[in-house]
């Protein structure tokens, strides 16, 4: 079983310090929501992000959206060989049941995440998505993998197919992919740093390479 964690993801509700900012207020009003209940999104809240620490990397739910679409629609997931988790910058962990169908439409995805932040589970009863306050270290300790790998541009260079073989040789490997646009991980992560290419790659590209090359050896 491969455990994939999209970590330090820039997925959060609008922070209290900027809920009165016109960009947030007007956006929330258009959507008939309270400012504190909307997902922070750099596309709409660029001017408000300038007021935040690390503002240049925050408000990127699109990264999580594309990563989840790719991972949950993969053959590995359909064959029961994959578990996917999202860890956020504020140390929340989203547990995702393999049968979950993430909305392809981005606006619907945003609405789903806002409901999850508000209610802790969605949909009520089925709990396909469940959120808990938990650090990345606590999640890793809970999963108890027999190998932890951190995808990092300064990691040990390894060809994707070679890395897939390494993962396939373990019972319960865990791979961490950054859910942020640039910069480094905020969390301290134990594990071996791995780089699959000579230049930086987008998170969803890394997710694809990991899963496809893992599938090559296990399916």
UniProtKB/Swiss-Prot annotation:
SUPFAM superfamilies: alpha/beta knot
Superkingdom assignment: Archaea
Taxonomic lineage from the root: Archaea, Methanobacteriati, Methanobacteriota, Thermococci, Thermococcales
Keyword rRNA processing carried by entry: yes
GO molecular function: rRNA (pseudouridine) methyltransferase activity; rRNA binding
HAMAP family according to UniProt: NEP1 (MF_00554)
Stabilizes Arg-60 (site feature) positions: 62
InterPro entries: Alpha/beta_knot_MTases, Rbsml_bgen_MeTrfase_EMG1/NEP1, Ribosome_NEP1_arc, tRNA_m1G_MTases_N
Annotated function: Methyltransferase involved in ribosomal biogenesis. Specifically catalyzes the N1-methylation of the pseudouridine corresponding to position 914 in M.jannaschii 16S rRNA.
Family designation: Belongs to the class IV-like SAM-binding methyltransferase superfamily. RNA methyltransferase NEP1 family.
Pfam families (alphabetical): EMG1 (PF03587)
Matches recorded under NCBIfam families: PRK04171.1-5, PRK04171.2-2
Enzyme class, UniProt record, top EC level: transferase
Keywords (A to Z) from UniProt: Methyltransferase, Ribosome biogenesis, RNA-binding, rRNA processing, rRNA-binding, S-adenosyl-L-methionine, Transferase
Catalytic activity line of the entry: a pseudouridine in rRNA + S-adenosyl-L-methionine = an N(1)-methylpseudouridine in rRNA + S-adenosyl-L-homocysteine + H(+)
Coiled-coil spans in chain: none
Annotated EC: 2.1.1.-
Protein name (database record): Ribosomal RNA small subunit methyltransferase Nep1
GO terms of biological process kind: rRNA base methylation
Residues that bind S-adenosyl-L-methionine: 178, 183, 196-201
Record-annotated site: Interaction with substrate rRNA: 60, 101, 104, 108
Quaternary structure, from the entry: Homodimer.
């Amino acid at each position: 079983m491969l455990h994939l964690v999209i970590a330090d993801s820039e997925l959060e509700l609008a922070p209290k310090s900027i809920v009165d900012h016109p960009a947030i207020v007007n956006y929330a009003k258009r959507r008939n929501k309270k400012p504190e209940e909307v997902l922070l999104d750099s596309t709409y809240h660029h001017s408000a992000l300038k007021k935040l620490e690390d503002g240049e990397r925050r408000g990127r739910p699109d990264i999580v959206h594309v990563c989840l679409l790719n991972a949950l629609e993969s053959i590995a997931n359909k064959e029961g060989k994959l578990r996917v988790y999202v860890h956020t910058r504020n140390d929340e962990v989203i547990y995702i049941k393999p049968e979950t169908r993430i909305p392809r439409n981005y606006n619907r995805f945003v609405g789903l995440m806002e409901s999850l932040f508000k209610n802790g589970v969605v949909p009520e009863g089925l709990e396909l998505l469940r959120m808990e306050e938990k650090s990345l270290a606590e999640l890793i300790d809970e999963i108890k993998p027999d190998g932890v790998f951190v995808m990092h541009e300064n990691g040990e260079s390894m060809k994707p197919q070679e890395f897939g073989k390494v993962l396939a040789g373990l019972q319960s490997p865990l791979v961490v992919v950054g859910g942020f646009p640039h910069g480094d991980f905020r969390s301290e992560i134990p594990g071996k740093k791995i780089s699959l290419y000579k230049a930086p790659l987008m998170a969803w590209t890394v997710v694809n390479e990991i899963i496809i090359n893992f599938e090559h050896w296990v399916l």
